[in-house]
C-alpha cells in the first residue's frame, strides 16, 4: 500500500531529520545524537535519535517513523469517524527539545502525512503538523520572533492561514484540567488536503523548514544567560505541565500507543527530570509570576 507521493514525502522527512539533528548538534557544541533504528511487527519502522547531556540541551529527541496497519486507531479517526477502521499509512518527524538552561525555552515540532484506504474507494490523504514554544522565563522579543517566523512562512499560502493555525495551536496545547496554556503556541494544523497535494506538501515543508529559523536564534540569545537553583526548580516544576499534556491530551502520543508504536520513541518527548509541588503559587510580581500573567494567556504576538 503506497500513495503515489509517499516516496517524495518520506525523502523530505528523512532529510528534515538529518538537517535538524545537524543544526542542533552545532548549536550544542558538545553532544551528538545517538541513532536507534527500529522496526514494527505490524508493519513499518523508524529511526529515533536522542541527544543527552549536552552543553545546551539536557535532552533532545528527533524521531522519524513510517508505519502502516490494517485499522486506523481511534485517536486518528476521532475527528473523522468516516475513516474509522480503514487501512492506513502514516509517516512523520516529531521532535522535542529540553534545554538545560531555564532561560532557553523547550520547543516541539512535528510534520506528518497520513493515508487511509478502503477497498473500492479512493484513498484519503492529509497532512498535519506545526511547532510550539514552551518558555519558563519568557522574553517578549523571543515570542515576537517565534511568531514572526510562523506568520511569514504562512503568508505565501494565504492571509488567513497564520491566524487560523495560530488559534488552533493555542486551543490544542491547552491543559483543560488546569485551564492553562502549555506555552506561547505557534502553529498547529491537521487534516490538510483541501489545497490539493502539491500546495499542502509545500506548506508542510515550509513548517518543517521554518522550525530551525524560529528556534535557533532564541537558543543563541539565551544559552549563556546565568541561572541558579531557583530557576532550575521552576523549570522542573513547569516541565510537569509538559508531562501532563503529553500523557493526558496529546493525540500524537495516543496514536503512537494505540497503533502499537515503539513506546521508547513515543515517550522520548518526556523531560529527563521533572517535579511536582502541591499547591505551588508564584510570588506576585516575580519573574515566575510573569509567565502566568503575561505569556500563557493567548495573545497576538505579531
From Swiss-Prot:
Cofactor: a divalent metal cation
Keyword terms: Cytoplasm, Heme biosynthesis, Metal-binding, Oxidoreductase, Porphyrin biosynthesis
Region (Important for dimerization): 242-277
Site (Important for dimerization): 177
Catalytic activity from the UniProt record: coproporphyrinogen III + O2 + 2 H(+) = protoporphyrinogen IX + 2 CO2 + 2 H2O
Lineage top rank: taxon: Bacteria
Gene3D superfamilies: Coproporphyrinogen III oxidase, aerobic
Binding residue positions for a divalent metal cation: 98, 108, 147, 177
Presence of the UniProt keyword Transferase in the record: no
BP terms from Gene Ontology: protoporphyrinogen IX biosynthetic process
This protein's record includes keyword RNA-binding: no
Subcellular location: Cytoplasm
One GO CC annotation: cytoplasm
Catalytic residues, chain numbering: 108 (proton donor)
InterPro entries linked: Coprogen_oxidase_aer, Coprogen_oxidase_aer_sf, Coprogen_oxidase_CS
Entry binding sites for substrate: 94, 110-112, 260-262
Gene Ontology molecular function, alphabetical: coproporphyrinogen oxidase activity; metal ion binding; protein homodimerization activity
Enzyme class: oxidoreductase
Enzyme Commission number: 1.3.3.3
Pathway membership, UniProt: Porphyrin-containing compound metabolism; protoporphyrin-IX biosynthesis; protoporphyrinogen-IX from coproporphyrinogen-III (O2 route): step 1/1
PANTHER family, per the entry: COPROPORPHYRINOGEN III OXIDASE, MITOCHONDRIAL, OXYGEN-DEPENDENT COPROPORPHYRINOGEN-III OXIDASE, MITOCHONDRIAL
Function of the molecule: Involved in the heme biosynthesis. Catalyzes the aerobic oxidative decarboxylation of propionate groups of rings A and B of coproporphyrinogen-III to yield the vinyl groups in protoporphyrinogen-IX.
Binding partners and assembly: Homodimer.
Family note: Belongs to the aerobic coproporphyrinogen-III oxidase family.
The protein's name in its UniProt record: Oxygen-dependent coproporphyrinogen-III oxidase
Native source species: Chromobacterium violaceum (strain ATCC 12472 / DSM 30191 / JCM 1249 / CCUG 213 / NBRC 12614 / NCIMB 9131 / NCTC 9757 / MK)
Originating gene: hemF
